[in-house]
Amino acid sequence: MTYLPVALTIAGTDPSGGAGIMADLKSFQARDVYGMAVVTSLVAQNTRGVQLIEHVSNQMLKAQLESVFSDIKPQAVKTGMLATTEIMEIIQPYLKKLDCPYVLDPVMVATSGDTLIDASARSYLKTNLLPLATIITPNLSLIHI
């Protein structure tokens, strides 16, 4: 029996399907990769902008991470929108234990220009998550940050 490679995305949602975990899962599927997702934030957005962001509870975030990592071992992990320091602090121990490639996509600003991450979270990301990444995939507009 042939098994598909498995990848995990940890990010926010995008109901329009153009970004976030929805886009990640479509990308995985297009490459014949079995995709799993842990949702960090629920984002109401469209092509006109971001209307509302609600972060999942710490309890829910931890439960999703435990559910995935206790069952199916990903062969690659990608993080996207990690909007708060608290979210990053919960995820970081899982990233430290990885024995697979980790892709860090530092999503800080929506395509519409709306800010998705605060200054303290940006600093935490640079100091604590950047060193763990196998590869970093910032948008061109974020390279100077």
Protein language model annotation of sequence segments:
Residues M1-A76:
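Small-residue (G/A/S/T)-rich helix-start motifs and N-terminal tracts that mark the onset
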Residues G12, D105, N139:
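Active-site glycine-centered loops adjacent to acidic/histidine catalytic or metal-binding residues
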Residues L25, Q92, L140-S141:
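Short glycine-/small-residue-rich flexible loop motifs, especially phosphate/cofactor-binding loops
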Residues T40-V43, V107-M108, S141:
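Short, ordered loop/turn segments at secondary-structure junctions
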Residues G49-I135:
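Ribokinase/PfkB-type carbohydrate-kinase core domain
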Residues I143-I145:
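Conserved small/polar residues in nucleotide/adenosyl-binding loops
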